[in-house]
């Protein structure tokens, strides 16, 4: 009998057959599994009777027999292991084995007695008979037709998994990604892929256009196949919006970019024409995969996020109940008493900001460093309590009684700064909205947030997705104050919410321009405002009491930074006080190399200092680390800085995994070693990651090797992180070039224009579009609930 080619391939692979004694570990999310297997047969030189088998599997059953295909590896701590790429379930052939198999947790509703009846009726070949014809079960006592069909279907799925995994492996998918694909499609996996391999991009996290296109090519799909062109358009739209911060792309530009992508590797001379791309865009629009409006193409989540934010902002801003709420004489009297009590003298623009904040439904407060934004926020809070006769002591309120003033910011560190400056509780926006993981946000339009006054700080970091969720959850009766510096870097995610709100001129706005910290002798603030205008001081290299410039070339940066940090340590500063910032990761002056050097200075190895190696990186207790992945459910966000407080080795815990405990300002999280890619060292970090934070000492290398990244708003953001001291090191020419370079990408957004449209017109437009769509526009993130910018971006995995 001729063997199937796949079977020949399997027999050539190293294998291990055995019974699963124990499932040591199984991750329900990524399916990573560690098993202890009693070996009955193997192609390898394995002397142990029981071996650890690792791989990505569904929930395998203890006491069941499987054949694993892969290779022997030696783990540095756990010794010899069999690393499985795929596996197959051995069909039991004895009556006892079949009864145990059918009555296992794999088959819901089949108990031992029913399994015994099946074996009694069908004999030792029961499983093969059921796989061949499900109707053989219909005459089995104790088994209804519905249960019989369910059992037969489950058997087909479990037995089919073996062939599916083999095929996916041949398609070039690794075991982890193969399991993700199987989870998405189950028994229909191969049919779905054959039907349209590009559907994988939409349905399976971790598969990008490149991987799907490689598969499409292997399957013989033509270069101008409609599904390929549509997938390329979605990929281009997604990656451009995420990398450039746009909420849309002009249709003409989208066609050009798609042609450029696909024609780089045209198949068999099949080039994509403008008409091919245009037809695909029309088809995507008709299928509601994108929204086309006035020559612009949007993802639905971005289109409706902008629509909803504009509608809510205009509605809230139109409230009139706060006008003339307090007579001017009463306001001025209370303000004067506040100035005396707090020993502060408010400037005219600051008084205007406080008065508008208390008499408007919404206020935008903007200004650069040192202009008194924090002073104004503190004044608003104090005067609100005074004029409304409410206590500002959180302990005076009962557990179920809402505190009237709500303070929030996009990141944990920004919220902490807000709390420190006001003396009141402050939270992240995700915490305010009640993020609860996969279920999304607790607070929505149906269950709005509580309070009377809401102040949002660091609003330049607010992207359109989060802004949409925020404004949906704000009830009409809450006054809103939005604070931020429009000259800082925009949000990581799409949109430019603060800039668009300011440009729309539909919301009362106060711009603080007078610099107060400069009067206190802060040359850092003076430098920031000069940079904002494209200028540098004549005395740039002359040392001041809070700023210095050290000339050096790119090859000398590590040595200079090392000396600066060592000197700061001698003066009593700690790793928490010192922050090195750089715009690039690679190179001698890059973040990666600087972190290695800084760790050796700030947290060197010691005899009792525990450490773990992850790839080429060593982590130690006491290390300063930077979170890279949003985990709103744990109140930890991309950009948060923490400290490794404990390290536990695998032999010391029941999970049998190396672990690190990280404290983010008292909020502790435990990471298993395989999740160490969620953070990195924070002795040196990117300027983007530092946004929303302040540090006593900032060390900023600026060299010509950074030229691709040097821009005015980047440098402006970097130097405004320094609270007490700023040490610039590098080349004057590089700094001058960066300050003159104001060519930051102009984000393409529609929020400003939508804010100028009347609410009635917007309602009519939304209603017309809703009739064409298969879902409710009130859920702006259909299919993407709770998604962050990083969740939205799919990266290819092997």
Curated annotation (Swiss-Prot):
Q: Which residues bind ATP?
A: 370-374
Q: Which SMART domains match?
A: AAA (SM00382)
The UniProt catalytic activity note for this protein reads: Couples ATP hydrolysis with the unwinding of duplex DNA at the replication fork by translocating in the 5'-3' direction. This creates two antiparallel DNA single strands (ssDNA). The leading ssDNA polymer is the template for DNA polymerase III holoenzyme which synthesizes a continuous strand; ATP + H2O = ADP + phosphate + H(+)
Q: Which GO terms describe its cellular component?
A: cytoplasm; exodeoxyribonuclease V complex; nucleoid
| One record GO biological process | DNA recombination
- This protein's UniProt keywords: ATP-binding, Cytoplasm, DNA-binding, Helicase, Hydrolase, Isomerase, Nucleotide-binding
Indicate where this protein resides in the cell: Cytoplasm, Nucleoid
What EC identifiers does the entry list?
5.6.2.3
Q: One Pfam family, please name it.
A: UvrD_C_2
Q: Induction: what does the entry report?
A: Approximately 25 monomers per cell during exponential growth (at protein level).
Q: Which GO terms describe its molecular function?
A: 5'-3' DNA helicase activity; ATP binding; ATP hydrolysis activity; DNA binding; single-stranded DNA helicase activity
- Knockout or disruption consequences: Replication forks collapse more frequently. A modest (2.8- to 3.6-fold) increase in spontaneous mutation; the mutations observed are not consistent with a mismatch repair defect. Increased sensitivity to mitomycin C (blocks replication by adding bulky N2 adducts), single- and double-stranded breaks generated by phleomycin, alkylating agent methyl methane sulfonate (MMS) and UV damage. Increased sensitivity to MMS. Increased sensitivity to H2O2. RecD2 is synthetically lethal with recG and with ruvAB. RecA threads persist for a longer time after induction of DNA damage.
- Name the major location: cytoplasm
Q: Which family does it belong to?
A: Belongs to the RecD family. RecD2 subfamily.
Q: Share any extra remarks.
A: There are no RecB or RecC proteins in this organism.
Q: How does it assemble?
A: Interacts with SSB (sbbA).
Task: State what this protein does.
Answer: In vivo may favor replication restart by preventing RecA from binding to blocked replication forks, avoiding unnecessary recombination during replication restart. Acts as a negative modulator of the RecA-ssDNA filament, may dissasemble RecA threads, can act as both a positive and negative regulator of strand exchange. Probably stabilizes or aids normal replication fork progression, is important for survival after treatment with DNA-damaging agents that can result in replication fork stress. Overcomes the inhibition of replication restart by RecA/RecO, probably by displacing RecA.
Name of the protein this chain belongs to:
ATP-dependent RecD2 DNA helicase
Whose protein is this, by species?
Bacillus subtilis (strain 168)
């Amino acid at each position: 009998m001729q063997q199937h080619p796949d079977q020949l391939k399997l027999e050539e692979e190293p294998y291990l057959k055995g019974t699963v004694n124990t499932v040591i570990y199984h991750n329900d999310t990524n399916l990573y599994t560690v098993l202890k297997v009693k070996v009955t047969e193997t192609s390898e030189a394995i002397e142990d009777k029981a071996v650890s088998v690792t791989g990505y599997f569904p929930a395998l059953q203890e006491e069941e027999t499987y054949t694993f295909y892969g290779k022997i590896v030696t783990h540095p701590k756990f010794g010899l292991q069999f690393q499985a790429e795929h596996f197959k379930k051995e069909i039991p052939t004895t009556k006892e084995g079949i009864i145990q198999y059918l009555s296992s947790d794999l088959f819901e509703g089949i108990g031992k007695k029913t399994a015994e009846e099946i074996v009694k009726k069908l004999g030792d070949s029961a499983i093969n008979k059921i796989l061949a014809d499900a109707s053989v079960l219909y005459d089995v006592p104790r088994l209804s037709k519905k249960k019989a069909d369910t059992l037969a279907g489950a058997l087909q799925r479990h037995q089919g998994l073996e062939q599916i995994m083999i095929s996916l492996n041949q398609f070039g998918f690794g075991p982890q990604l193969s399991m993700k694909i199987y989870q998405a499609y189950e028994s229909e996996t191969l049919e779905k892929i054959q039907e349209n391999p590009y559907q994988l991009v939409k349905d399976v996290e971790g598969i990008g256009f490149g991987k799907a296109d490689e598969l499409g090519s292997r399957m013989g799909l033509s270069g101008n196949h409609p599904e390929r062109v549509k997938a390329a358009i979605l990929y281009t739209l997604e990656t451009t919006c995420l990398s450039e911060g746009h909420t849309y792309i002009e249709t003409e530009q989208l066609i050009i970019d798609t042609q450029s992508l696909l024609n780089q590797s045209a198949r068999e001379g099949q080039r994509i024409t403008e008409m091919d791309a245009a037809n695909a865009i029309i088809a995507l629009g008709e299928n509601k995969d994108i929204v086309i409006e006035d020559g612009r193409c949007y993802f639905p989540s971005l289109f409706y996020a902008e629509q909803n934010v504009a509608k809510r902002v205009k509605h809230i801003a139109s409230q009139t109940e706060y006008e003339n709420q307090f007579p001017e004489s009463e306001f001025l009297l209370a303000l004067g008493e506040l100035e005396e009590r707090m020993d502060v003298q408010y400037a005219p623009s600051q008084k205007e900001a406080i008065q508008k904040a208390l008499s408007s439904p919404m206020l935008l407060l903007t200004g650069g460093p040192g202009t008194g934004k924090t002073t104004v926020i503190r004044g608003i809070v104090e005067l609100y309590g005074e004029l409304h006769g409410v206590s500002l002591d959180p302990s005076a309120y009962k557990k179920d009684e809402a505190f009237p003033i709500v303070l929030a910011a996009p990141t944990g560190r920004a919220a902490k700064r807000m709390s420190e400056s006001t003396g009141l509780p402050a939270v992240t926006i995700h915490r305010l909205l009640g993020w609860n993981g996969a279920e999304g946000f607790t607070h929505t339009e149906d269950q709005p947030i509580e309070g009377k006054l809401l102040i949002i700080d660091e609003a330049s970091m607010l992207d359109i997705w989060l802004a949409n969720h925020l404004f949906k959850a704000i009830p009409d009766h809450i006054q809103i104050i939005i604070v931020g510096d429009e000259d800082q870097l925009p949000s990581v995610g799409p949109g430019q919410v603060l800039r668009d709100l300011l440009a729309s001129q539909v919301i009362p706005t106060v711009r603080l321009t007078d610099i107060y910290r400069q009067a206190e002798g802060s040359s850092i603030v003076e430098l920031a405002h000069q940079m904002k205008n494209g200028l540098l001081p004549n005395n740039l290299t002359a040392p001041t009491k809070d700023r210095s410039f050290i000339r050096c070339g790119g090859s000398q940066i590590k040595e200079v930074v090392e000396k600066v940090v060592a000197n700061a340590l001698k003066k009593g500063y700690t790793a928490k006080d010192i922050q090195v910032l750089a715009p690039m990761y690679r190179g001698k002056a890059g973040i990666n190399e600087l972190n290695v050097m800084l760790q050796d200075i700030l947290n060197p190895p010691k005899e009792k200092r525990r450490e773990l190696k992850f790839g080429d990186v060593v982590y130690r207790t006491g290390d300063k680390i930077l979170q890279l992945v949003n985990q709103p459910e744990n109140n930890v966000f991309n950009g948060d800085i923490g400290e490794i407080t404990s390290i536990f080795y695998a032999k010391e815990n029941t999970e049998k995994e190396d672990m690190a405990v990280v404290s983010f300002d008292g909020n502790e999280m435990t990471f298993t070693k395989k999740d160490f890619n969620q953070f990195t060292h924070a002795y040196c970090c990117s300027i983007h990651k530092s946004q929303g934070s302040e540090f006593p000492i900032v060390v900023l290398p600026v060299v010509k090797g950074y030229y691709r990244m040097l821009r005015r708003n980047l440098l402006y953001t970097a130097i405004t992180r320094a609270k007490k001291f700023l040490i610039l090191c590098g080349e004057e020419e590089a700094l001058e070039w960066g300050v003159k370079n104001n060519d930051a990408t102009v984000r393409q957004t529609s929020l400003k224009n939508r804010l100028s449209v009347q609410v009635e017109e917007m309602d009519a437009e939304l209603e017309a579009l809703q009739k064409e769509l298969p879902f409710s526009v009130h859920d702006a993130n259909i299919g993407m609930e709770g998604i962050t910018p990083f969740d939205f971006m799919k990266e290819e995995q092997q």
